[in-house]
Amino acid sequence: HSANVAALAATAVTQLGGRTLVLTTTLKAMRAIAQALTVHFAKSGALNAKGGSEMGGIEVLLQGQWPKRRLMERFRQGGTEGQRGCVLVASASFWEGFDVPGKALQLVIIDKLPFPPPNDPLVQARTHRLELQGLNPFNDYFVPEAAIALKQGSGRLIRQTSDHGVLVVCDVRLVTKGYGRRIVGALPPMRRLNSEDEWKLALADLPK
């Protein structure tokens, strides 16, 4: 799955010249996607040993590479003239508190629905408590929490009324599972893209 997400991101990043945030639900996926993107742009000649090229190119940024504030500053610069375009791959804390208004961020890609981790002791305790109350932990806890987290992640895209962008959620459960409609319903109003061609046209229509 991570390889497919990276391939989709590489296509979009190339078209947009960066301007992309990839949010993952696990650190393992984050590292795999960042590595795949780095290899892709190195092979395409868009990267050098320092992570970018002097003649444009793409710089792949990774959560933990620098402090969060420095990553945000570098990402913002990626949308300005004379600076390499950036794609940032991140997880955890970057689902909220990542504020990049304007054209520097035009695409957010989310690898999977952000359900709470079932092996987390706090999640297990919450699940047990709901079961004792006769409730369904998945419907009454996991789905609402995923909806909230997805809304937070998608909120990285539009920070002011003049912003334009595209959100991609790489999880078929949004359309194949009944709870997918509940999660989509929690997102801000946006036009839905129903094909790859529509997606590419939407990217092409974004302000340069």
What positions do the PLM features span?
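ASCE RecA-like P-loop NTPase motor cores
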Residues: 1-208
